[in-house]
A protein has these predicted regions:
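DNA polymerase processivity clamps
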Residues: 1-178
Length: 178
């Protein structure tokens, strides 16, 4: 049986950060043991100790680093990946290595502030919601443990929170006005 040392193979965080018109939203940001991905319509936060097999030391090396969504998608295809100071070192079957270096991003939104603002539960009644159905497909693939998730409206009905009961993963879908 093959051993995998990488992100969960089915965790497609790259789908939650592919904004062609806003390049800053085409990166996955690693901070405080979590991975954040956002395209301004959806946001996901996954705890690295839950959604990967990286060691605590490797998770610490990721702190404050960024990787492009296309590089992340490529990294998922490898079974053996090590986190180094330079980036992700992917080991091929013949012991050759491919390195995906960390990206430099100079101005990235503080996603934890966005999350805490949207964590307040809704106190208003709501009669209509408008959600792009493709957001559900993206967040299902980008959020760890989605099958155990539930949804709730945020205060002011600005967003739909997607929380997993069995992990610290959280997703946010920004709602549209009707």
């Amino acid at each position: 049986m093959k051993t995998r040392h990488n992100f969960n193979k089915d965790l497609r965080m790259d789908l939650a950060c592919s904004d062609y018109f806003r390049p800053v939203f085409s990166y996955i940001h690693f901070k405080d043991g979590c991975a954040y991905a956002c395209d301004t319509h959806i946001l996901v936060k996954n705890k690295l100790s839950e959604c990967s097999t990286f060691t605590e030391e490797e998770i610490e090396k990721l702190d404050g680093k960024f990787i492009g969504s296309k590089a992340y998608k490529s990294i998922l295809s490898y079974d053996m990946v090590q986190v180094t100071d330079m980036g992700f070192e992917c080991i091929l079957y013949d012991n050759q290595k491919v390195i995906y270096p960390f990206s430099e991003v100079y101005k990235y939104p503080e996603m934890e502030n966005v999350i805490s603002e949207h964590l307040k539960e809704s106190t208003e009644g709501i009669t209509k919601l408008r959600i792009d159905p493709s957001f559900f497909s993206k967040i299902e693939k980008a959020l760890f443990n989605f099958e155990y998730a539930y949804m709730q409206l945020s205060e002011g009905n600005k967003s739909l929170l997607v929380k997993s009961k069995d992990s610290d993963s959280i997703g946010i879908i920004m709602l549209k006005s009707i």
